[in-house]
Amino acid sequence: MDVKRVKQILSSSSRIDVTYEGVPVWIESCDEQSGVAQVYDVSNPGESVHVHVNALEEK
């Protein structure tokens, strides 16, 4: 995935399924300059991680 698509997903009112290493995640935010997104596991929303947007996949 790229930064442009992550930003589109963040601004969308629709639910868009995204995974990180095969795990369903919600995207919390995205830093356009670094290409890093803050995501959290849908099943464990208490823990977020920062990942490169290239590691995210839209399902």
UniProtKB/Swiss-Prot annotation:
Q: Which cysteines are joined by disulfide bonds?
A: none
Subcellular location, record wording: Spore core
A GO CC term?
A: endospore-forming forespore
An example GO BP is: sporulation resulting in formation of a cellular spore
Q: What induces it?
A: Expressed only in the forespore compartment of sporulating cells.
Q: Does the keyword Transmembrane apply?
A: no
On whether Isomerase is a keyword of this UniProt record, the answer is no
**Which one Pfam family would you cite for this protein?**
SspH
Q: Which domain of life is it from?
A: Bacteria
InterPro entries this protein is in?
SASP_SspH
Q: Which residues cross the membrane?
A: none
**Primary localization:** other
Mind listing the UniProt keywords for this protein, alphabetically?
Sporulation
Q: Which family does it belong to?
A: Belongs to the SspH family.
Name the record gives this protein: Small, acid-soluble spore protein H 1
Species annotation: Bacillus anthracis
